[in-house]
């Protein structure tokens, strides 16, 4: 008796995800997924490390991930954006697995130590980036949606889009940076990286500085995201997905 509802929910989620992936323009899904994978690779490099601040390479691309999530949340909803976030995280894990296998295969053709070190990665960096991304994505998506409800009189206006993207991005980026930094550089790095570590203060300042830097990028590029979502609405993008969700909610 319990297995049938569970199987039904799984089929419903599978169908919803399949329709959603067909509904969101492929360019946005591709950019989003690639940015998530790149964040994982770039996070292996510390760009700046001072007593009060530390920044890793993920800051260079993470703003794009959040901009894509904000666009999807605005047009398709927080649930849809979260589904796509999980999809991107799974692709990231599969990519990292391929990199790991490639780096683990011995080769005498040349010295691939640098390649193996970069693309082989470490399991705790993958763990930190995946956990941090999923938590921050959920909070970003649903806070974005909640803030949008405060502008019921003009939900599609520039002010509404700006406020929901700026606030949710800052919150999400701070949590993403902080959770990742604590997991990787406070807990695991001292054990596996010969004593190298960040302090909690460095993690907090990294998270704050990174959130501010990525917020600036969001401010610079949000007009593009706003125009894209306006075009999506004008061209009725995603009607199949909206029809599906309406049918499911009516059952």
What are the roles of these predicted feature ranges?
Residues 55-60, 127-135, 167, 171, ...:
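Hydrophobic alpha-helical transmembrane segments of multi-pass membrane proteins
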Residues 100-109, 182-192:
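Membrane-helix interface motif
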Residues 101-124:
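Membrane-interface interhelical connector segments
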């Amino acid at each position: 008796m319990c297995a049938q509802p569970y199987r039904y929910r799984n089929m419903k989620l599978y169908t919803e995800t399949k329709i959603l992936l067909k509904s969101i323009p492929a360019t946005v899904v591709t950019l989003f997924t690639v940015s998530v994978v790149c964040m994982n690779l770039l996070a292996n490099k510390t760009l700046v490390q001072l007593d009060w601040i530390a920044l890793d390479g993920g800051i260079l691309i993470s703003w794009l991930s959040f901009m894509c999530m904000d666009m999807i949340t605005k047009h398709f909803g927080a649930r849809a954006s979260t589904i796509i976030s999980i999809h991107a995280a799974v692709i990231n894990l599969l990519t990292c697995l391929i990199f790991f296998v490639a780096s683990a295969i011995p080769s005498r053709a040349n010295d691939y130590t640098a390649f193996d070190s970069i693309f082989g990665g470490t399991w705790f960096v993958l763990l930190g980036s995946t956990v941090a991304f999923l938590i921050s994505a959920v909070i970003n998506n649903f806070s974005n949606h909640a803030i949008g409800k405060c502008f019921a009189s003009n939900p599609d206006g520039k002010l509404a889009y700006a406020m929901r993207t700026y606030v949710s991005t800052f919150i999400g980026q701070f949590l993403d940076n902080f959770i990742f930094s604590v997991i990787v550089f406070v807990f695991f790095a001292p054990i596996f990286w010969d004593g190298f570590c960040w302090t909690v203060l460095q993690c907090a300042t990294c998270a704050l500085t990174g959130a501010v830097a990525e917020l600036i990028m969001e401010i610079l590029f949000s007009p593009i995201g706003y125009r894209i979502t306006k075009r999506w609405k004008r061209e009725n993008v995603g009607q199949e997905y909206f029809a599906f969700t309406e049918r499911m909610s009516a059952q």
